[in-house]
């Protein structure tokens, strides 16, 4: 089973429609997968609930916040169940409080499994000017995450020192999930050593050949990794947008980096991985799948590990 720990299904459907695609959720999720869908405004969140209840779950009357895909069977062990989870947060690129009341209502009624995306984005001058507002909504969301004891899903670009500044508060949360982690193994280790129950979600940067992310996939603590597509975002060079099914290529390359290595590569990190020619820069997920050679046993070992991490990060239990 695959894990897509961060994606935007409503945006994906809209993107498909804008380029002449069907924009239907059935085909992208025809493979077994558990998902965490991220929303930033109430209309997007409500679309998620309708999309999955009607098209995937077949049960529009389900009262649960953890909607289980139609392939699941209730008596299966947790490791084999497929889940659709929802997160909601005020994004640092639009750090306004218009949706704060809606977010708090979701928290009070236990309709979401995490707060996020939240965090900081200092990627360009426009976003840097929003830093005071980003700090305000970040503080508010951390306070609520502690109050309701929910994980946070972190968006961070060029702002990791600000996240480190919040370590005393992050330590009080059940889990901290770094969406689209692009940092180094050393930075990731630092969060863990400081007592943060952190998970690091790896996306299509492993297909772009981003050295630090490939090093994470290759040799970082296996109990701390997740996988994602961020669909329809995080596209590769030859792709108009990302598909949810790209999680298959992300997973294959992560497993490839982790298992198709010599013992010397295992011990010496990203430089050795690159020298061993395991790191590749693919222009599309399709091209990646055509080239990656990894046996099914290795894929299963890797996905079983990611499923366990997903369940732990989001507090799922039988």
Residue ranges, per PLM feature:
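Mid-domain alpha/beta scaffold segments of enzyme catalytic cores
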Residues: 1-318
């Amino acid at each position: 089973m695959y894990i897509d720990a961060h994606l935007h299904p409503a945006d994906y459907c809209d993107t498909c429609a804008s380029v002449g695609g069907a924009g239907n959720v059935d085909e992208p999720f025809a493979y077994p997968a558990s998902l965490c869908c991220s929303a930033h405004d109430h209309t997007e969140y409500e679309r998620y609930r309708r999309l999955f209840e009607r098209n995937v779950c077949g049960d529009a009357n389900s009262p649960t916040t953890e909607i289980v895909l139609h392939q699941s069977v209730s008596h299966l062990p947790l490791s084999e169940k497929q889940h659709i989870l929802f997160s909601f947060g005020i994004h640092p690129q639009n750090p306004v409080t218009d949706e704060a009341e809606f977010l708090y209502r979701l928290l009070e009624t236990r309709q979401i499994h995490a707060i996020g995306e939240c965090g900081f984005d200092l990627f360009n001058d426009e976003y840097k000017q929003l830093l005071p507002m980003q700090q305000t909504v970040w503080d508010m969301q951390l306070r609520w995450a502690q109050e309701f004891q929910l994980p946070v899903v972190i968006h961070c670009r060029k702002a990791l020192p600000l996240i480190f500044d919040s370590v005393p508060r992050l330590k009080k949360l059940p889990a901290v999930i770094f969406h689209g982690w692009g940092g180094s193994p050393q930075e990731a280790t630092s969060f863990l050593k400081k007592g943060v129950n952190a998970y690091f979600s790896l996306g299509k940067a492993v297909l772009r050949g981003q050295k630090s992310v490939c090093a994470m996939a290759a040799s970082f603590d296996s109990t701390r990794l997740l996988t994602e597509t961020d669909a329809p975002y995080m596209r590769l060079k030859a792709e108009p947008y990302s598909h949810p099914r790209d999680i298959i290529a992300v997973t294959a390359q992560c497993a490839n980096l982790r298992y198709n290595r010599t013992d010397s590569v295992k011990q010496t990190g990203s430089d050795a991985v690159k020298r061993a020619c395991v790191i590749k820069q693919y222009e599309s997920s399709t091209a990646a799948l055509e080239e990656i050679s990894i046996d099914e046993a290795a894929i299963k070992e890797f996905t079983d590990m990611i499923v366990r991490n997903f369940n732990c990060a989001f507090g799922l239990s039988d």
